[in-house]
């Protein structure tokens, strides 16, 4: 079990009053808060080692380069990549998925298909729309059954026409965790390249890209107690060798002639310009922090919170929860609506009680269209949340229901 009270002391932002109430932060699927150790690591870099990497031979540059590449090795171990050549630093999951879709444009042709699901974040939809538009390939969707991915639908649509399968490991709306290992095996049987959006799984569970046999895996630092503006793209070396750089300029070149240029070896051929050194160091520090807690313990804690709060939410008359009712399939995300109350009004009412949740379409408009709802509220949990936070959410929802009684 986690010592949550000790963990909370590492996050000073949580110790504040919002609208005369103690803050209950339940918007972790959007971004997580940062522990002091991460803030100190970033400050330490700027205070002591601020210099460009891979370029200078002076002491600060050497220290900065060593820290930056040590961060890459930390990430490699965290996801069990086979080599640091397979770990690329990006601006975040969105950038990572765009890079893979750009690679797909080099492979796809008319008559080919890309298979995604209706539960995807826009960042795992729009890049594929563009890739298909440019190449004449077809974008095919897998739909839902009982609030989870319809595996029968997936099997039926996973033919040899499919060249790429790109799915969320965990939905940022439904909270459902997809059986990625099984899906990857099915994708590889038809020769498809498997791409996984790990933005909502990497912060919450142990990831082993080799065990899952993923071809590409993307995630962001800010959703796992790390800084904003830093993310990771893991790719199997054989595909990264085939993949053309997406950005060009300093740092990624081997040699430049008047009419041509050659690239550095992996992973640096993809990292043009001055990288986010402080972000990489901050992310590696966040990884170290999470690993000291233990990713199995992180997952177990969130499962305990969901098991505690889910039936309490179900008991609220007029509250609709989206996604599978099988809690074994769920992560720490719960999307809901309360009667006909607009989710923005609901979120505002909860904020009056000090409870921070998300409201809107959660960058998943095709999913909400499929569910036939314009928007929803969403509560999402992390390592510093408690059962008391769950109780406060339920109590705030009951107060909101009573306040708006008779209006929905």
Describe the predicted segments one by one.
Residues 1-408:
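Pyridoxal 5′-phosphate
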């Amino acid at each position: 079990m986690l010592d949550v009270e000790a963990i909370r002391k590492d996050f000073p932002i949580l110790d504040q009053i919002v609208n005369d109430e103690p803050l209950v932060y339940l918007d972790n699927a959007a971004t997580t808060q940062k522990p002091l150790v991460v803030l100190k690591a970033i400050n330490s870099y700027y205070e002591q080692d601020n210099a460009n990497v891979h370029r200078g031979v002076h002491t600060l540059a050497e220290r900065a380069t060593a820290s930056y590449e040590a961060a890459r090795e930390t990430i490699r171990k965290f996801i069990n990549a086979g080599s640091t050549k397979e770990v690329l630093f990006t601006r975040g999951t969105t950038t990572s998925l765009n890079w893979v879709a750009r690679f797909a444009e080099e492979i796809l042709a008319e008559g080919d298909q890309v298979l995604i699901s209706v539960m995807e974040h826009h960042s795992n939809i729009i890049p594929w729309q563009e890739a298909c538009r440019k190449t004449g390939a077809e974008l095919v969707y897998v739909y839902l059954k009982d609030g989870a991915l319809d595996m029968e639908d997936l099997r039926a649509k996973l033919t040899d026409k499919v060249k790429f399968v790109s799915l969320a490991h965990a939905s940022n709306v439904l909270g459902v965790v997809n059986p990625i290992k099984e899906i990857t095996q099915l994708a590889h049987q038809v020769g498809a390249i498997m791409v996984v959006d790990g933005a909502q799984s990497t912060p919450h569970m142990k990831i082993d890209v080799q065990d899952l046999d993923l071809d590409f895996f993307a995630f962001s630092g800010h959703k796992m107690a790390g800084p904003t503006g830093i993310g990771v793209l893991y790719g199997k070396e054989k595909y990264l060798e085939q993949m053309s750089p997406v950005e060009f300029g300093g740092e990624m070149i081997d040699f430049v002639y008047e009419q041509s240029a050659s690239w550095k070896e992996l992973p640096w051929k993809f990292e043009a310009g001055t990288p986010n050194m402080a972000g990489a160091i901050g992310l590696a520090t966040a990884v170290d922090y999470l690993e000291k807690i233990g990713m199995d313990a992180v997952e177990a804690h969130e499962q305990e919170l969901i098991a505690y709060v889910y039936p309490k939410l179900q008991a609220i008359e007029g509250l609709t929860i989206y996604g599978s009712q099988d809690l074994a399939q769920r992560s720490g995300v719960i999307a809901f609506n309360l009667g006909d109350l607009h989710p923005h009004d609901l979120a505002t009412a909860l904020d009056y009680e000090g409870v921070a949740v998300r409201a809107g379409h959660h960058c998943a408009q095709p999913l909400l269209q499929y569910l036939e709802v314009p928007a929803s509220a969403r509560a999402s949990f992390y390592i510093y949340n408690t059962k008391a936070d769950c109780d406060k959410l339920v109590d705030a929802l009951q107060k909101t229901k009573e306040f708006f009684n008779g209006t929905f």
